[in-house]
């Protein structure tokens, strides 16, 4: 019988199918220590889970790890939920994690510190963003469990201190996996209502695990985004949660939160009484001062002799009117003088004057130009006549009229010496009235003797 050989891929896929169809391996709860932790740029987490005797590769994709409450680190002990599968490329089995939590109180404290540091770096704890708690809130919203001692303490304290105030309770879960989303939704609902002036968010005391909902990042960010001022009241005085740092004001207990949110009506009544007395005293003092002033006025000269005062004022009015008339006349005279000066200036600098002056200047220049052109033409004409006379005196035609002629060779070059021709050469002689074509039949040389 021929043996059947499997490929590595086929074997790996077979093993992967076996594992993935095993119901016990599709929902595995596992605890271990993180090592070789790597956070990929795309958001996926890759690490190893180990205990004293074994280890397993672990993967947590970005879609799942964005909801975890802490930042994983090497050496941290965790509780995870996931499924087992095979990574074909390496042939190794690994756990694909869907949920992860710190294992033990120590790791919860680490997760708490990690979130606190990160939110503080983002500025969520800064005093710059803290809203002022209104001193006389008409309506107080309370976000807490409807059945705990905290709600009883808060309502009792508000009704005792400020019975005219309104209280609206937003019942929520304060511990467990659904607590944080429940608190976040209540904060959003309260912000959609216009009548809420201040919010109390909190619960009674408990362990770190029981208070953990108030350490959730989503709760911290919901408190930070709230338009309504929030007083946090979580646990006892020694309990501090992330919500306390983000809230606009932290109360050590729910009862203290109610005291901070609701003014004491007895103290308010006392303040109103004191201010009423102060106002009455101020009014009495004001009336007394006005009465004294009235008495002074009644004793004054104006009240005792009103006619004389009237006559004085009438005389002052007449003088003022006279001064006004004089001032008006001076003002008019001043403006008339200014107008005359401006008219004289405009007349002096009127464009017609400048046009006339320019026209005279142009006519003068034209006459001067004509004279200079006439003189120049006469000078040039005289020079031309003299030059023509000189040219005529030097003209060969004048010489020819006295019986002389010009002799040219066959190339029409003027012959200046008998040495330039030979016997039999054809020459032409230009006379005054024509040209003779000749042939050299004899040559007789003569010595030059002073031109003779």
Curated annotation (Swiss-Prot):
It holds the Pfam family tRNA_anti_2. Its EC number is 3.1.11.6. GO terms for biological process: DNA catabolic process. It catalyses: Exonucleolytic cleavage in either 5'- to 3'- or 3'- to 5'-direction to yield nucleoside 5'-phosphates. GO terms for cellular component: cytoplasm; exodeoxyribonuclease VII complex. It is found in: Cytoplasm. One of its GO terms (molecular function) is exodeoxyribonuclease VII activity. Belongs to the XseA family. PANTHER family: EXODEOXYRIBONUCLEASE 7 LARGE SUBUNIT. Bidirectionally degrades single-stranded DNA into large acid-insoluble oligonucleotides, which are then degraded further into small acid-soluble oligonucleotides. This is Exodeoxyribonuclease 7 large subunit. It comes from Bacillus cereus (strain 03BB102). The lineage of its organism: Bacteria, Bacillati, Bacillota, Bacilli, Bacillales. The gene is xseA.
């Amino acid at each position: 019988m021929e043996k059947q050989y499997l490929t590595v891929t086929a074997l790996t896929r077979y093993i992967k199918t076996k594992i993935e169809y095993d119901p016990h391996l599709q929902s595995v709860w596992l605890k271990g220590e993180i090592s070789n932790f790597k956070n990929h740029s795309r958001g996926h987490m890759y690490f190893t889970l180990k205990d004293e005797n074994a280890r397993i590769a672990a993967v947590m994709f970005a879609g799942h790890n964005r909801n975890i409450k802490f930042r994983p680190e090497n050496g941290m002990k965790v509780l995870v939920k996931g499924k087992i599968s095979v990574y074909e490329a390496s042939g190794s089995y690994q756990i694909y994690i869907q949920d992860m939590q710190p294992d033990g109180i120590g790791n919860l404290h680490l997760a708490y510190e990690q979130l606190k540091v990160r939110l503080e770096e983002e500025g969520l704890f800064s005093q710059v963003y803290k809203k002022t708690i209104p001193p006389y809130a008409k309506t107080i919203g309370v976000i807490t469990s409807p059945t705990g001692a905290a709600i009883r303490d808060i309502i009792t304290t508000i009704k005792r201190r400020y019975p005219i105030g309104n209280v609206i309770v937003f019942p929520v879960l304060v511990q467990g996996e659904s607590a944080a989303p429940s608190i976040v939704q209540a904060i959003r609902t309260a912000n959609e209502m216009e009548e809420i002036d201040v919010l109390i968010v909190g619960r009674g005391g408990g362990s770190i695990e029981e208070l953990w909902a108030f350490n959730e990042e989503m709760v911290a960010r919901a408190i930070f985004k709230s338009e309504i001022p929030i007083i946090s009241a979580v646990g006892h005085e020694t309990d501090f949660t992330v919500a306390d740092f983000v809230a606009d004001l932290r109360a050590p207990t729910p009862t203290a939160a109610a005291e901070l949110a609701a003014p004491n009506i007895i103290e308010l009544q006392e303040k109103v009484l004191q201010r009423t007395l102060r106002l009455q005293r101020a009014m009495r003092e004001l009336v007394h001062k006005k009465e004294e002033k009235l008495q002074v006025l009644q004793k004054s000269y104006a009240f005792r002799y009103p006619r004389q005062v009237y006559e004085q004022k009438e005389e002052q009015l007449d003088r003022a009117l006279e001064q006004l008339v004089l001032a008006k006349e001076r003002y008019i005279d001043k403006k008339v003088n200014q107008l005359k000066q401006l008219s004289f200036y405009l007349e002096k600098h009127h464009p017609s004057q400048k046009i006339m002056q320019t026209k005279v200047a142009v006519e003068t220049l034209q006459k001067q130009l004509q004279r200079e052109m006439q003189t120049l033409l006469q000078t040039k004409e005289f020079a031309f006549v003299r030059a023509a006379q000189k040219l005529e005196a030097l003209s060969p035609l004048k010489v020819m009229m006295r019986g002389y002629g010009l002799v040219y060779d066959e190339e029409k070059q003027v012959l200046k010496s008998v040495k330039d021709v030979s016997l039999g050469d054809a020459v032409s002689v230009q006379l005054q009235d024509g040209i003779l074509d000749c042939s050299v039949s004899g040559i007789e040389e003569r010595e030059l003797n002073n031109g003779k």
